[in-house]
């Protein structure tokens, strides 16, 4: 039985993950953790997620170390915001708890802190900006295509619901990185985030990145390879959060096979790296 703790337990992703964990025969939900000061503290998480009483009360992230010591999870799943996730990862690695992290928006400095914590502690970790199986096949297709279409102009367009807090999405950033790495470019040097005014002629190396926000869009990602006389579009559309949650469940099951002290991603989980 895999003992699972979830931070961001009452968020869109967190509550969906909890509902799914409660359905899995080889998993046990042992902790549901929310932001400090949450008014839901002490409430049974099953009641919040529509499952009735499950015997797991919502706890406050300010007491995370105590919660981990009391509940002894095998893995902690984090879908929060970057600043909170860094502190969660610090505490979890100190406690020797493995990690599945889908939080996005980390700065380079924050990501280095995360790497240092995982390497120093030797815990197992899967960290991915998007855990949907289809998106990770999408990344593989981009990796394979980019060198073949290296003389084509590349534009990345992502669209999400109005409530999404970071832009561009972690998935769009990862697509940028995949294409840049596959074509010998440095993502930070070639990315152009939106365009306005007299921008002049497009350079051959630049990669445009554009974010759309509106309505209840779960997540659309389009990579456009534009050449002379033709264009190729690689598209992934998420119809519901079930796509992401299914990937999280696979990552939880994979974690014991992950390499200690090294960040692995969904490509490793799916065996396509």
From Swiss-Prot:
Residues involved in (S)-2,3,4,5-tetrahydrodipicolinate binding: 161, 170-171
Main localization (coarse): cytoplasm
Keyword Cell membrane: no
MF (Gene Ontology): 4-hydroxy-tetrahydrodipicolinate reductase; NAD binding; NADP binding; oxidoreductase activity, acting on CH or CH2 groups, NAD or NADP as acceptor
A single cellular component GO annotation: cytoplasm
Uppermost EC category: oxidoreductase
SUPFAM superfamilies: Glyceraldehyde-3-phosphate dehydrogenase-like, C-terminal domain (SSF55347), NAD(P)-binding Rossmann-fold domains (SSF51735)
Domain of life: Archaea
Catalytic activity: (S)-2,3,4,5-tetrahydrodipicolinate + NAD(+) + H2O = (2S,4S)-4-hydroxy-2,3,4,5-tetrahydrodipicolinate + NADH + H(+); (S)-2,3,4,5-tetrahydrodipicolinate + NADP(+) + H2O = (2S,4S)-4-hydroxy-2,3,4,5-tetrahydrodipicolinate + NADPH + H(+)
Localization annotation: Cytoplasm
Catalytic residues (UniProt): 160 (proton donor/acceptor), 164 (proton donor)
Gene Ontology biological-process annotations: diaminopimelate biosynthetic process; lysine biosynthetic process via diaminopimelate
KW Lipoprotein (keyword) present: no
CDD domains linked to this entry: DHDPR_N
Pathway stated in the Swiss-Prot or TrEMBL entry: Amino-acid biosynthesis; L-lysine biosynthesis via DAP pathway; (S)-tetrahydrodipicolinate from L-aspartate: step 4/4
Amino-acid positions noted as binding NAD(+) in the UniProt annotation, renumbered to this chain: 8-13, 34, 102-104, 128-131
Protein family (similarity comment): Belongs to the DapB family.
Role: Catalyzes the conversion of 4-hydroxy-tetrahydrodipicolinate (HTPA) to tetrahydrodipicolinate.
Protein name from the UniProt record: 4-hydroxy-tetrahydrodipicolinate reductase
Organism: Methanothermobacter thermautotrophicus (strain ATCC 29096 / DSM 1053 / JCM 10044 / NBRC 100330 / Delta H)
